């Protein structure tokens, strides 16, 4: 293999159980949308089943069908909005659906469809969801039309923020949600996402928490200290060469070598998910030695500067650690967003469970 990602099964299970403990042992909804944040939705879902995760969250019907066709028979919730034809198919397949508007409810009634419904309320995200003030009317409509209302949920927009203002806003969202669900007895009531679990575990409402990026050891853009690294992107040295000081490296001649150097080429580029912004400040590890990424990252290749202490010991085919949670945590690059990076891991990168 040229480039691959190793997924640590036991560390993933540890992280899920640790976060479940922090969430006062609430039931876990495993969010495996966007190919489980780039790591492989089917593989991750199968691991989560081993720690008693029985409900999975996806973005759309297509992702739900992918899980079902891979043999995942557990409950699946489409967290995003669905088109009318998707609501029809979801009902046939027994997939739970998020409903955010009266128009969707009226469509279900008009077509005599009765899927498992989770009503979504907008407590401050300003994306999808009913208005909080309409809660009583919407819930009453479901009851009067014998709709199968199994859940109510909302989404925290800034629970990974670290200021007093962001904390207060999150608490306001939780309080709004509390007013909706206070006297309800439903199978699924949920508002807490990963950062909601780690940062607001004393304020968790309901009987379910949604666990996504937290499984992979992150709260927001920072690694959670008590969680374990679960993924490592690795590659191999493809080419090695010694060059003179002042040589330009890669497209655009933006980088000039400050001294006579040894550089190596890795068979991974932005087509594989190694973002171009890592050209400034990014690094990889060879035998625990930090090697700076130099020049613009190319579509299929990346150049690194090899430190003098290992330049005579490396060889073509040597293994390179390109990215793991600790490297991402150490990078001081404003453009870096862990979610964006993970979901951008390309299909050429083989996913391997270890």
Swiss-Prot record:
Function per UniProt: Catalyzes the interconversion of L-alanine and D-alanine. May also act on other amino acids.
EC annotation from Swiss-Prot or TrEMBL: 5.1.1.1
Reaction equations catalysed: L-alanine = D-alanine
TM annotation in the entry: none
Cofactor: pyridoxal 5'-phosphate
Domain of life: Bacteria
Record bears the keyword Isomerase: yes
Gene Ontology annotations for the cellular component aspect, listed alphabetically: cytosol
Entry annotation: catalytic residues: 33 (proton acceptor), 251 (proton acceptor)
Sites of N6-(pyridoxal phosphate)lysine modification: 33
One GO-annotated biological process of the protein: D-alanine biosynthetic process
Entry coiled-coil feature ranges: none
Keywords, comma-separated and alphabetical: Isomerase, Pyridoxal phosphate
Pathway: Amino-acid biosynthesis; D-alanine biosynthesis; D-alanine from L-alanine: step 1/1
UniProt: substrate binding residues: 127, 299
Family: Belongs to the alanine racemase family.
Molecular function, one GO term: pyridoxal phosphate binding
Name the record gives this protein: Alanine racemase
């Amino acid at each position: 293999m040229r480039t691959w990602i190793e997924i640590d099964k036991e560390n993933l299970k540890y992280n899920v159980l640790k976060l479940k403990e922090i969430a006062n042992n609430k039931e876990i909804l495993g969010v495996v949308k966007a190919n489980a944040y780039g790591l492989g939705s089917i593989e991750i879902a199968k691991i989560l089943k081993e720690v008693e995760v029985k409900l999975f969250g996806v973005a759309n019907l297509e992702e739900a069908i992918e899980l079902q066709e891979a043999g995942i028979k557990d409950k699946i919730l489409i967290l995003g909005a669905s088109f009318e034809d998707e609501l029809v198919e979801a009902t046939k397949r027994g997939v739970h659906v998020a409903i955010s508007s009266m128009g969707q409810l009226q469509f279900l009634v008009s077509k005599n469809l009765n899927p498992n419904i989770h009503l979504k309320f907008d407590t401050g995200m300003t994306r999808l969801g009913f208005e909080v003030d309409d809660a009583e009317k919407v819930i009453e409509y479901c009851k009067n039309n014998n709709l199968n209302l199994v859940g109510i949920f909302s989404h925290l927009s800034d629970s990974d923020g670290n200021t007093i203002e962001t904390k207060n806003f999150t608490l306001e969202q939780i309080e709004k949600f509390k007013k909706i669900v206070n006297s309800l007895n439903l199978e699924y009531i949920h508002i807490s996402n990963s950062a909601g679990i780690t940062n607001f575990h004393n304020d968790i409402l309901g009987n379910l928490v949604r666990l996504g990026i937290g499984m992979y050891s992150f709260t927001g853009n920072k690694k959670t200290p008590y969680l374990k690294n679960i993924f490592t992107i690795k590659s191999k040295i493809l080419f090695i060469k010694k060059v003179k000081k002042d040589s330009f490296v890669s497209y655009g001649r933006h980088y000039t070598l400050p001294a006579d150097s040894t550089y190596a080429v890795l068979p991974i580029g932005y087509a594989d998910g190694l973002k171009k912004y890592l050209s400034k400040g990014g690094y990889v590890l060879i035998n625990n030695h930090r090697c700076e990424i130099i020049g613009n990252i190319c579509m299929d290749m990346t150049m690194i500067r090899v430190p003098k202490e290992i330049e005579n010991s490396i060889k073509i085919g040597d293994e390179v650690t390109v990215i793991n949670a600790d490297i991402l945590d150490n990078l001081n690059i404003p453009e870096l967003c862990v979610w964006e990076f993970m979901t951008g891991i390309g299909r050429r990168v083989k996913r391997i469970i270890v």
